């Protein structure tokens, strides 16, 4: 059995009394003071997450733009240096290998940020794609790129919440007010290279900082000493992302779930040159997907968990819950679910089977709480 990994901040989490649990191959903090308190801190003030378990891959070389566009559903070519893009890597069937962020430094250099649970799979898949024939090559040659796997040497913090900008500038002494949503810049922190972006996974304004482990350790210590930023675990990271309808790989996304089914086709640019999964997604978009990801709101106070059955009014199973909570911000029992497309219209009455009892629910938009990003 493979040993659980630890981030550079592991000892600090333990010292703070965090509840630790395995996630994506790492021993990670689930909560410190409690999920509700940490969730509310991010919604109203500021919280910091150790997200050093995420994976990072550098792609460089003269074919870097074409290669990234070949493995990535969004279009990096028109993006300007300093821009981040969200999208997916797709298999030939249109299923999602992973969802990720791409940071464009220039036409010849990109950073790909991938999910912790998929690091090994993604790295192998990306390296395999290097040997594919470049569709633009008249000679039928593979891509001329270098792929550097840097997950082991890059650590990451996410500072999130309406007070994040003030905290980053005043506590960490990092100028960030110039960054707009989904942009980034390269900076120096005590002489060390770092990257800061105005991105996050909470539905609130915030920043993600990538740097060497010793730099991230020092930033964490400053934040803790300041008392202006609550340490937050992965428990509230999940409740926060869920409330604003952001997907989690393994729940709303998977190798056998397509962007059409997950309602993410706005991040699949079918008009760009050939890329992995394009034909399958194009065909499904034209024909219509058999399943669709929807929101559900329950009438009663109950918690629908991942995998629970969704039923129609005739008690026939028509889908399953991908994520469900009693929403902390809205005080409603809600869920995201993958259901038969015939039952996906807003307002459709359905049921969720929780243990041996069924609870009535209604299909609603899957964004249960309004995002508060700074544009």
Residue ranges and their predicted role:
Residues 1-87, 95-97:
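Acidic, proline/glycine-enriched N-terminal capping motif
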Residues 80-96, 177-190:
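Conserved alpha/beta core surface patches that mediate binding of polyanionic ligands
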Residues 1-24, 28-30, 105-375:
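Conserved, structured C-terminal
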Residues 100-104:
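Conserved thiamine diphosphate
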Residues 55, 59, 92, 97, ...:
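Short coil/turn segments at secondary-structure boundaries
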Residues 35-44, 90-99, 141-143, 188-195, ...:
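Short amphipathic beta-strand starts and helix->beta connectors
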